[in-house]
Regions:
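Active-site phosphate-binding strand-loop segment of PLP-dependent enzymes
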Residues: 1-77, 83-85, 230
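PLP-dependent aminotransferase class I/II
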Residues: 4, 12-16, 21, 25-27, ...
């Protein structure tokens, strides 16, 4: 439980939306009502969740919502970029200061900030792409549904679980599979792309070893890192391409 990890130095809680599906932010808020929530919505722009009978969009229900416009995201720019949203006016004003060296007035700095402005080129690309986001998300959901059906009879594959309260935008279509590395090699041999998100859990990353974490402390994350594989789900996939992916995966498992 998240509450067990909260200590005297805790400043905020960061629920992470993974693979296009929102985290249960209302449950986190109920469990830890005294701390602000910063929703990591980098992979979920356009996703939604029903909370108390209301449709809440990704980034909307937290104290701050953060989005990524990295080119690989569902709404990607031409290069790096991102956005933070909030309904708190004081936080919004501070974020605006921080993005431009910590000052509201040029050459006057109220605090130490950053050079984090979205450049005009990225903004132009995103403005052109934004009207298509809903259509692209629908295409991803349709492709995901096709995969769900096509893999339903293969016990070696676990398709993505989608919380009934959520509408995912499938930033990735990530399956858990047996013989993951062999399957990925087989797909590559057939000219089909795939990716592992993510091969090493955070607690085992070299940069965090000073904290004393060791293998076996987060068994679910470790098992996932050894079994997950993301296959193509982008909305431009043709029926023939979908069939090729499905047929190749099924052939690997002798189906």
């Amino acid at each position: 439980a998240a509450a067990a990890a909260v200590g005297s130095r805790s400043k905020a809680v960061i629920p992470v939306d993974l693979f296009g599906q929102m985290a249960p932010i209302e449950a986190v808020r109920a469990e830890i009502p005294t701390l602000p929530l910063i929703e990591d919505a980098a992979q979920s722009i356009g996703a939604s969740r029903m909370i108390d009978g209301k449709k809440v969009m990704a980034g909307e229900g937290a104290t701050i919502g953060t989005f990524s416009f990295f080119p690989s995201k569902n709404l990607g720019g031409y290069g790096d970029g991102g956005m933070m949203v909030t309904q708190d006016e004081a936080i919004a004003l501070r974020l605006k200061r921080l993005r431009v060296h910590g000052g509201a007035k040029q050459y006057f700095h109220d605090e130490v900030g950053y050079n984090s402005r979205l450049d005009a080129l990225q903004a132009a690309v995103l403005v052109a792409k934004l009207p298509h986001l809903s259509h692209w998300s629908a295409g991803r959901r349709a492709n995901a549904a096709y995969y769900d059906s096509a893999f339903a009879d293969i016990p070696e594959i676990v398709t993505p679980y989608i919380d009934p309260a959520n509408e995912s935008i499938f930033n990735q279509y990530t399956i858990r599979v047996e013989r993951r590395d062999a399957l990925q090699a087989f797909l590559k041999e057939k000219g089909i792309g795939s990716a592992i998100y993510y091969p090493l859990p955070l607690h085992l990353q070299p940069c965090f070893q000073y904290l004393g974490y060791r293998e076996g402390q987060c068994p679910v994350a470790e098992a996932a890192a050894k079994s997950v594989l993301s296959i193509p789900v982008f909305p431009e996939l043709t029926s023939a391409q979908l069939d090729e992916v499905v047929g190749t995966v099924r052939a690997f498992y002798g189906r």
